[in-house]
């Protein structure tokens, strides 16, 4: 071994179904060698399937939105303090990585990674991303 930390902490099997480890990962009685926390029962695909506020539902909405948009090239990527903005044609993805709300970009809101009502009107809350179509 190299003595360097491994990547095992970020390479845990996807929790598919059930209410206990291994959450539907793998056939039979085998167990993954990377442990899965018991708390993951709420994060299985099965548990998120019908929840409109789940991470799975968010990713499905993001994929549907992306398929509906033109396949333009990325025209710019900008980091300004705690804000990351990626532009692709008329689409802007703005990520507020900071701890304070920022003004929302103008345009049609296509997708938000979280509720926007936790910030003043017209602002993007902290730790939230939006897709906006100009």
Question: Which residue ranges define each predicted feature?
Answer:
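Loop/helix patches that line or flank the sugar-binding groove of alpha-linked glycan CAZymes
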Residues: 1-91
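Buried hydrophobic-core signal for structured, non-transmembrane domains
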Residues: 92-96
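C-terminal beta-sandwich/jelly-roll accessory domains of carbohydrate-active enzymes
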Residues: 97-134
């Amino acid at each position: 071994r190299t003595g360097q930390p491994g990547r095992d902490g970020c390479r845990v099997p996807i929790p598919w179904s059930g209410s206990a480890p291994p959450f539907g990962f793998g056939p039979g009685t085998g167990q993954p060698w990377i442990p899965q926390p018991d708390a993951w029962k709420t994060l299985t695909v099965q548990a998120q399937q019908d929840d409109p506020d789940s991470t799975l539902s968010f990713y499905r909405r993001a994929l549907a939105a992306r398929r509906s948009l033109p396949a333009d090239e990325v025209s710019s990527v900008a980091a300004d303090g705690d804000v990351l903005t990626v532009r692709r044609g008329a689409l802007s993805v703005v990520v507020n990585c900071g701890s304070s709300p920022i003004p929302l970009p103008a345009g049609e809101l296509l997708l938000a990674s979280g509720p926007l009502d936790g910030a003043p009107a017209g602002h993007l809350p902290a730790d939230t991303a939006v897709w906006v179509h100009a």
